[in-house]
């Protein structure tokens, strides 16, 4: 297998109208997906999308390519990414496709693909699709077109699935929950699930207009959520990203609870309930405080490369069931085959009930190390790997920050930027080193 040109950390993503998110490419992509993934007994592919204004247009183009191969489609409409994973498996489809730009602004969009078992494609299958895209598009025999149909009441199907993962007597009536749906794919489903389970729900960002997805809201911008949690004296806040596969939480005091803390809370509960299999998979970004906290509990930790697919693959390799990214991708393989913000939230709420503890109490059982994150957006790529100053930092940072420290500098797989993470025990030193690295990269 050689270098993947289009598929990155989480599918294909980019600005709409700029290669590869163009009509020509998506037509061929749909055709290629139909040929590579659609040829089995069922010959049907699920398609869902988030609330972006470009979603229906891109869906139509992609669907034409798929139908032209003789493969039929089942349209789910606007649904969370994790719902498409569930439908792909439960409806016995050949594949599932999500048209979403995740946490990116509205002018970006992308394609995520699930295999028939509801998990993200392997790199080998992605390569096969890319190879087919290079071929000349063959105009179809119209008699052999696939058929386009809608999934009947997809919201109810997915809501039932989420609920069935938890005890029938789960009662959230003691909680006031602020839900920030980022004007994205969870805007209908999330409020209904939590209300059905008895919670008092106050909603934020549930009025999508096609261009306000993730705008001053969602898992990457929780300032508004923090303010509302405090002003409403709520028990907690939940912020999903645009396609609903991430969640970041806010406790009743307005403190952020990220994916690292969430997976620690869940792992400790699974250990207590004797449900834990092996340990926890994280990434190179997982906070050192969480790793040390898991170690104290006797829970092994294994890092995977960045990306929820990489986390999933490492969990399967280790034959474990838990994994997470700091950004809020929480994988609970005993409940679902992919990251799911709603299911992760319900598990934390169940843990709060079982232990008679607030989210603040649960998340403060570990001491997080100071971390500083910077995104350096670039107009053109910069070869920072060969810069002597950067290399000196990457080899000698422990002399500055101490042994319990880390420095990571990497290219983003989803945006045109360099991501910097500096971690250590002294916040001032961590902050100063992060700023120095950022300035150095900008001057390259």
Swiss-Prot record:
Its cofactor is Mg(2+). Its EC number is 5.4.2.10. GO terms for molecular function: magnesium ion binding; phosphoglucosamine mutase activity; phosphomannomutase activity. Gene3D superfamilies: Alpha-D-Glucose-1,6-Bisphosphate, subunit A, domain 3, Alpha-D-phosphohexomutase, C-terminal domain. InterPro entries: A-D-PHexomutase_a/b/a-I, A-D-PHexomutase_a/b/a-I/II/III, A-D-PHexomutase_a/b/a-II, A-D-PHexomutase_a/b/a-III, A-D-PHexomutase_C, A-D-PHexomutase_C_sf, A-D-PHexomutase_CS, Alpha-D-phosphohexomutase_SF. The active site is at residue 102. Mg(2+) binds at residues 102, 241, 243, 245. CDD domains: GlmM. The modification Phosphoserine is found at residue 102. Pfam families: PGM_PMM_I, PGM_PMM_II, PGM_PMM_III, PGM_PMM_IV. Activated by phosphorylation. One of its GO terms (cellular component) is cytosol. GO terms for biological process: carbohydrate metabolic process; peptidoglycan biosynthetic process; UDP-N-acetylglucosamine biosynthetic process. It comes from the Bacteria. It catalyses: alpha-D-glucosamine 1-phosphate = D-glucosamine 6-phosphate. Binds 1 Mg(2+) ion per subunit. Keywords: Isomerase, Magnesium, Metal-binding, Phosphoprotein. It is an enzyme of class 5 (isomerase). SUPFAM superfamilies: Phosphoglucomutase, C-terminal domain, Phosphoglucomutase, first 3 domains. Catalyzes the conversion of glucosamine-6-phosphate to glucosamine-1-phosphate. NCBIfam families: glmM, PRK10887.1. Belongs to the phosphohexose mutase family. This is Phosphoglucosamine mutase. It comes from Buchnera aphidicola subsp. Acyrthosiphon pisum (strain APS). The gene is glmM.
């Amino acid at each position: 297998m050689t270098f993947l040109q289009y598929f990155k950390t989480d599918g294909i993503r980019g600005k709409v109208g700029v290669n590869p998110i163009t009509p020509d490419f998506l037509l061929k992509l749909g055709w290629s997906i139909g040929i590579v993934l659609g040829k089995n007994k069922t010959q049907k592919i699920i398609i869902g999308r988030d609330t972006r204004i470009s979603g229906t247009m891109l869906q139509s183009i992609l669907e034409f390519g798929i139908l032209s191969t003789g493969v039929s489609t089942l349209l789910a409409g606007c649904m969370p990414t994790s719902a498409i994973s569930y439908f792909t498996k439960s409806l016995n489809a050949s594949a599932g496709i999500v048209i979403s730009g995740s946490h990116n602004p509205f002018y970006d969009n992308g394609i995520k693909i699930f295999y028939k078992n509801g998990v993200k494609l392997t790199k080998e299958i992605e390569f096969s699709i890319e190879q087919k895209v290079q071929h000349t598009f063959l105009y179809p025999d119209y008699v052999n077109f696939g058929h386009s149909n809608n999934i009947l009441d997809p919201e109810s199907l997915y809501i039932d699935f989420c609920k069935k993962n938890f005890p029938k007597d789960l009662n959230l009536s003691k909680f006031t929950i602020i839900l920030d749906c980022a004007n994205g794919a969870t805007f209908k489903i999330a409020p209904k699930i939590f209300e059905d389970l008895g919670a008092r729900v106050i909603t934020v960002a549930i009025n999508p207009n096609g261009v306000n997805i993730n705008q001053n809201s969602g898992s990457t911008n929780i300032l508004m959520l923090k303010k509302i949690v405090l002003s409403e004296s709520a028990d907690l806040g939940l912020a999903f990203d645009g396609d609903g596969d991430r969640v970041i939480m806010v406790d009743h005091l307005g403190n952020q609870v990220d994916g690292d803390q969430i997976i620690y809370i869940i792992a400790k509960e699974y250990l207590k309930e004797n449900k834990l299999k092996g340990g926890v998979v994280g990434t190179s970004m997982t906070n050192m405080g969480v790793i040390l906290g898991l170690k104290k509990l006797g829970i092994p930790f294994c890092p995977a490369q960045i990306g929820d697919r990489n986390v999933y693959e490492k969990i399967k390799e280790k034959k474990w069931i838990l994994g997470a990214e700091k950004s809020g991708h929480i994988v609970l393989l005993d409940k679902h085959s992919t990251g799911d913000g709603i299911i992760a939230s319900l598990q934390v709420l169940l843990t709060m009930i079982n232990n008679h503890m607030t989210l603040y109490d649960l998340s403060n059982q570990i001491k997080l190390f100071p971390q500083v994150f910077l995104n350096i957006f670039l107009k053109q790529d910069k070869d920072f790997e060969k810069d002597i100053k950067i290399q000196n930092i990457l080899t000698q940072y422990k002399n500055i920050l101490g042994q319990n420290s880390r420095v990571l500098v990497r290219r983003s797989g989803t945006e045109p930027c360099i991501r910097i993470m500096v971690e250590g025990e002294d916040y001032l030193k961590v902050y100063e080193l992060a700023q120095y690295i950022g300035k150095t990269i900008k001057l390259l």
